[in-house]
Amino acid sequence: MTQFIDCGGSKGKIFITHSVASEHVFSLARRLAKYPVPVLISGETGTGKECVARYIHDNTYAHDAPYVGVNCAAIPENLLEAMLFGYEKGAFTGAVTSFPGKFEQANGGTLLLDEIGDMSLAMQAKLLRVLQEQEVERLGSRQCLPLNIRLIAATNKDLEREVTAGRFRQDLFYRIAVVPIFIPPLRDRRQDILPIARFLLNKYQSCFLRRVNLSDEACQALLNHDWPGNIRELENVVQRGVILAEGDEIKAADLGLPTPHAQAKPGDAMISDVRRHGRNAECDYISEVLRQHQGNKTKTAAFLGITPRALRYRLASMREKGSDMSGR
């Protein structure tokens, strides 16, 4: 049975479960919400780790309890300590005012440390001390603030392997991994693909004021794809299909994915033709998104779920092949 699980938050995120594997994830999350222990959520990029973290928070605390998330990989090492622990005015050059860190902001609620596997060993040692002592001290201060938080850590890495390789502290691993939750990649829970795709289709039909359906060949293409980018990639593909579909039906070529029929036929010519159609669909989609964002490459990259550098590379490649870049 398909379930639509409200993961809360201002963005109204929904996690859709249909497979046994995804139902198990939320069954475990529901049980963990009853106990104030650290939780480690692992899984590939785009599998929905932040959504599960928010679900645990919403089923643990009252609606007004703080929920604070930090992406450890997105903050430079020299700023992460100040961001997490806070600082007093004059603690370092540029500290013109005092700043409460993320631990303080999350006190009485949940702190999500996303991509904790990217944290340096030196920063791991400082984090471990805060977790052991259950108190935090701002940079430039001698006053300790007692903490009462639920820590959730998330990573796309195998932390046990990172421990073995000496890149992650074993004592910190045991501290944060009291109960681990693993979210399987989308390719290992294919029963979830079409329910998620149809939910996203309804979402973007409303956004783009279009009424389209997924053709049988499009559904088969979705099921056959391995989804290295998981749900995030699936969302981009569905958006692309809604935008590029001619008429009231999304075909496999609109998604930029090879059709089952094309995959089954032998011969390099057929494979080359499928790839060319996929590339053309991708170019059309990128051009359309760039146009919607009035040529703003930073916003376009964020919408596509790629880095600005990757977008620049794709745009350069498209120009070399003579693609229409009217969105510039």
Functional labels for PLM-detected ranges:
Residues 1-23, 33-34, 60-65, 140-150, ...:
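Nucleotide-binding/hydrolysis machinery
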Residues 14, 28-93, 104-120, 185-190, ...:
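Conserved post-Walker A coupling segment in P-loop NTPases
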Residues 25, 47, 70, 84, ...:
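Conserved RecA-like P-loop NTPase ATPase core
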Residues 39, 45-49, 54, 271-328:
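Bacterial C-terminal helix-turn-helix
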Residues 68, 95-108, 112, 120-126, ...:
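AAA+/SF3 P-loop NTPase mechanochemical coupling elements
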Residues 90-97, 133-138, 161, 292:
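Short gly/ser/thr-rich secondary-structure transition/capping motifs
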Residues 125, 129, 137, 308, ...:
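Base-recognition residues in the alpha-helical recognition helix of bacterial helix-turn-helix
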